[in-house]
Amino acid sequence: MMSQQDLPTLFYSGKSNSAVPIISESELQTITAEPWLEISKKGLQLEGLNFDRQGQLFLLDVFEGNIFKINPETKEIKRPFVSHKANPAAIKIHKDGRLFVCYLGDFKSTGGIFAATENGDNLQDIIEDLSTAYCIDDMVFDSKGGFYFTDFRGYSTNPLGGVYYVSPDFRTVTPIIQNISVANGIALSTDEKVLWVTETTAKRLHRIALEDDGVTIQPFGATIPYYFTGHEGPDSCCIDSDDNLYVAMYGQGRVLVFNKRGYPIGQILIPGRDEGHMLRSTHPQFIPGTNQLIICSNDIEMGGGSMLYTVNGFAKGHQSFQFQ
């Protein structure tokens, strides 16, 4: 009879040595991002990267509510204001220059969207938390000035979330898809015919083909082209001018890239991920007029700081509503 010492034994080697092993996407074109700017030596939940018409970068940290403004040329970091609403999660910029800030509230029913100047003045409730029950995580404008937003509620077996469209006058809210589990990132194709949505806790990528009215789904138009694997899941996303979709993978320290049909074509790794560092990658965004991508992440679990990283993507970023 074979002794225990002589039995076949599993060893940590290769992919099993990584804190976050990549299995199904291991054959994709893979690059590693370079550090671009340290936001804080403290672990802040960075999110919401968005550039204004002058090329200034805005972002926030969710749990403390700080709104940051960064000059990409000088790397100067300013904090123009702090959100008066709890747990802000995204910033999108209107072409009139106002910041639209999505906030999660109590993560149950007190989320909303407010607008403000870049200094935090002239506050306006766009979706107010007192009259609705949304938990709003992200939004994307269309060319008419309306926008789609994601409702972040629910969990894997209790899909309370969804995606909604708000008319350009901000008076009408129309459901697009519902009964999904923690709707998170959202992006609109260059021709505004395809809406991309990430479903975090069910680990799914939704591709929604829209009719010309922007709210009706085409026959058989709502599909799930990709299922993600691993702990946590897909977070915020953006597109480039070739309609490739860049999806940050929260808890995995990487960004996955999909073509316009939803096939994975590449991935970007955050340095230190195999050792368990900087896993909270949340949001990719292009510097306007370039193919240079900025990615935010933080190292809260390992006691590290908060960083922005950079790579070049497949194509230049899409010039969306705020640049029209």
Curated annotation (Swiss-Prot):
It comes from Staphylococcus aureus. This is Lactonase drp35. Its cofactor is Ca(2+). GO terms for molecular function: hydrolase activity; metal ion binding. Keywords: Antibiotic resistance, Calcium, Cytoplasm, Hydrolase, Metal-binding. It is found in: Cytoplasm. InterPro entries: 6-blade_b-propeller_TolB-like, SGL, SMP-30/CGR1_Lactonase. The active site is at 235 (proton donor). Its EC number is 3.1.1.-. Its main location: cytoplasm. Exhibits lactonase activity. Acts in cells with perturbed membrane integrity and is possibly related to the membrane homeostasis. Contributes to bacitracin resistance. Induction: Induced by cell wall-affecting antibiotics such as oxacillin, vancomycin, fosfomycin, and bacitracin. Disulfide bonds: none annotated.
